[in-house]
């Protein structure tokens, strides 16, 4: 795994968490519809109740997955912070933190650091080369 791939893991994990949060929202909307259907029907609604139970079980499973993913993300960010702290150059540290911990775009980083975008790309390559991933990642 390259340094860039390793550092990018946090962003990918954050995306998966956000995707699961959207899925939960969708399931909540579905559960609300099922609840509405239950209150509308005065006859035996065992099918609707079962549908509602299935939605709730799926929501709980997703929430547990999100909790696990958040724990992983926190641990991964700690590892990335530790890796970045080993770099002597503060500009490299700032750039890597903005990109891989704050998930800023290249344009945002260029503005925040008062550099042109081409200089940010060059600085990024130098920053990546300054990291020895073999010492940090097993």
What annotation goes with each model-predicted range?
Residues 1-86, 133-138:
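N-terminal interaction/assembly modules
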Residues 120-131:
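DNA major-groove recognition helices of helix-turn-helix
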Residues 76-79, 90-92, 123:
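N-terminal positioning helix adjacent to the helix-turn-helix/winged-helix DNA-binding module
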